[in-house]
């Protein structure tokens, strides 16, 4: 059953969470809450992977071979309602920062972040011909939502980081 994790997978997830917590504290400042609760699972009625975050807590479906989702949801502890003015109208800010931060953490952990960035670029090229003028118009599917809100935003942040340098950009983010 893909919704059940082995004890070894849970140990690996705990190690990754500890690494991510230390990395994000070093990059963005102290963990902003008193405790952190991480749970794993799937949406009970569908068995589909569940990813959900709130202040001091996140739930994920563990992925084999990558800790991206774990790092992304953990990054939301710094970038959930702390960056955007509204998680409804400005959710792209929270998602872009969490995606960008997850890739930085993957890189620091020795995981393959380059392939993730390449996939972002390919996705962005795939929808480049489409026109999105208005924020309040529905997108044409979940993939487009992911590309626009998660990936394009993260690519924008990466461009800023590359333009000013990682240290300078991290200083800016910490100050923001």
Each language-model region and where it sits:
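Intrinsically disordered, low-complexity segments enriched in small/polar residues
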Residues: 29-31, 130, 148, 174
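Short linear capping/connector segments at secondary-structure termini
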Residues: 38-43, 121, 173-176
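Juxtacatalytic substrate-recognition/specificity segment
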Residues: 1-90, 139-143
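A generic secondary-structure signal for well-formed alpha-helical elements
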Residues: 28-32, 78-82, 86-87, 101-109, ...
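Glycine-rich, acidic and aromatic/proline-enriched surface loops and short helix-turn segments
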Residues: 22-30, 42-48, 103, 124-126, ...
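Acidic/His/Gly-enriched intrinsically disordered linker/tail segments
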Residues: 89-155, 162-164
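Extracytoplasmic/secreted proteins, especially bacterial periplasmic and envelope-associated proteins
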Residues: 12-19, 23, 69-73, 77, ...
């Amino acid at each position: 059953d893909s919704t059940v994790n082995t004890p070894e997978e849970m140990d690996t997830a705990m190690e990754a969470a500890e690494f991510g917590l230390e990395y994000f504290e070093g990059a963005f400042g102290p963990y902003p809450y008193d405790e952190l609760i991480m749970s794993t699972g799937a949406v009970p009625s569908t068995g589909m992977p569940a990813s959900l975050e709130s202040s001091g807590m996140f739930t994920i479906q563990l992925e084999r071979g990558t800790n991206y989702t774990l790092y992304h949801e953990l990054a939301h502890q710094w970038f959930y309602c702390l960056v955007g003015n509204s998680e409804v109208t400005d959710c792209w800010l929270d998602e872009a920062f969490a995606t960008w931060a997850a890739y930085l953490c993957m890189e620091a952990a020795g995981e393959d972040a380059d392939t993730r960035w390449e996939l972002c670029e390919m996705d962005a090229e795939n929808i480049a011909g489409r026109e999105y003028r208005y924020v309040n118009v529905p997108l044409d599917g979940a993939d487009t939502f992911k590309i626009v809100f998660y990936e394009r935003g993260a690519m924008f942040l990466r461009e800023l980081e590359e333009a000013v340098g990682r240290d300078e950009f991290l200083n800016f983010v910490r100050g923001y």
